[in-house]
Amino acid sequence: MTYEEKELLDIIKEDTMPALGCTEPIAVCYLGAFMNDYIKEDIAKAKEIDVIVSKNIYKNGKSVTIPNTGTCGLGLAAILGLSGGNKDDGLLVLTKFNDEMISRAKELREALNIKLSYDEKTPDIYVRMLVKFDDACVEGLLQKGHTNVEYIKVDDKVLYENKLEESSNEMKEFMSKLTLKKIKELVLSTPLEELDFIEEGVEMNMHAANEGLKLKNSNLLGQSLKKMENKNIISNDAYTKTRILTAAAADMRMSGGNCMVMTSGGSGNQGINVIIPIYLIYEEFNLKKEDMIRAIYFGHAINRFVKTFSGKLSGMCGCAIAAGLGAAAGITMMMGGTDEQIEGACSNMFANLTGLICDGAKNTCALKLSTCAGEAVLSAFLALNGCTPKENVGVVSGNIEDTIKNVGLLCRSAFNRVDDVMLDIIK
């Protein structure tokens, strides 16, 4: 492998991994689990637990159901980690919890003094936790990545430290200098044996989708769309199937189901949105397996590329402007599209869905995921049939890289204010 192939692969794999539950509350749970190794007293004796998070962690942790608990809340996520989590499980930190452990965590949440707040001047991903006892205080900080614990302190003494500032800056510099054409070249030249994780993600996310159709809840979007399809209210085709199964996977995940999904860019919903549309079009048209694998890898890479400019979390829905873009690009490439058609598919997505607000992780994310997945399919086939936006109209610039920068500017300079208003609404 060349340096560039390896660098891109390492960056993608860092944010593409199995996760159980929404990754924002899971990040809080993971930090609690990491702090376990440094807490010598029974957590039930804690006098106060302070959980300080970024605006986006707060927003995404407020209303999404934590797997196997039937309830929501970053306070519960923190206690789950502190009371029984194992840091070695990473984003699967909840997989080994049984009913007794969950019941105890719920009791501790009610009994302990847990203070939750958010800090407006932090990175997108930021969790700081202080566990205070009569004669000790344990503090942990996680930031810039869902499992990136930067330090653990006991009584202000640093016992663990892992700062990634330099490597993080190098990664951002590498990604920001890429183009869609260059990313495609690297995707196509990477040895196929290095992409085993792609098939693992397909299996995982399709399983979540199929299980989502079996959930016992008549109000779920995937099941509702499936019933409408069966009644011939909506069409029975690849576009509709994509919307149904993407929604079903989101239903499973957002309602606290016990299915792992493969993330993309650190997000499970975005992993669903990259993988399922590309895989279903591959099935529908009986395409080559290798082309599907590389298309999904391309989708992950485009998702991560956009996030270099928009941020890992923002006030704009990442499934619309990043993961959906990746799906559209991947489908177009897989169908034999030219570089111009791939850019056109991405421009279609931006012209259509830029500005879709992120109002936090919750059950209704299924609606947005379903829309973004369907529009990714539509955008790809429109581009393949010669229908793309004119240049320099609205957010769409003269080339796709500048369009991505335009949307990134909107995320950083305008939608941070949208986030503030949204937090006022949902608090």
Predicted regions located by residue number:
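Flexible, glycine/charged-enriched surface loops at secondary-structure junctions
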Residues: 42-48, 89-94, 115-117, 192-199, ...
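Conserved phosphate/anionic-ligand binding catalytic regions in large, soluble enzymes, centered on
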Residues: 18-34, 259-276, 318-322
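Membrane-embedded translocation segments of transport machinery
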Residues: 232-236, 240, 253-281, 285-287
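N-terminal alpha-helical transmembrane segments of multi-pass membrane transport
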Residues: 1-22, 26, 40-49, 53-63
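Signature of multi-pass transmembrane helix bundles
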Residues: 109-256, 421-427
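A structural signal for small-residue-enriched, beta-sheet-centric alpha/beta enzyme cores
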Residues: 20-23, 55-57, 144-147, 152-154, ...
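A structural-propensity feature for long, helix-poor, extended segments
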Residues: 45-89, 102-113, 291-341, 345, ...
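Alpha-helical support elements that line or immediately flank enzyme active sites
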Residues: 25-41, 271-287, 328-336
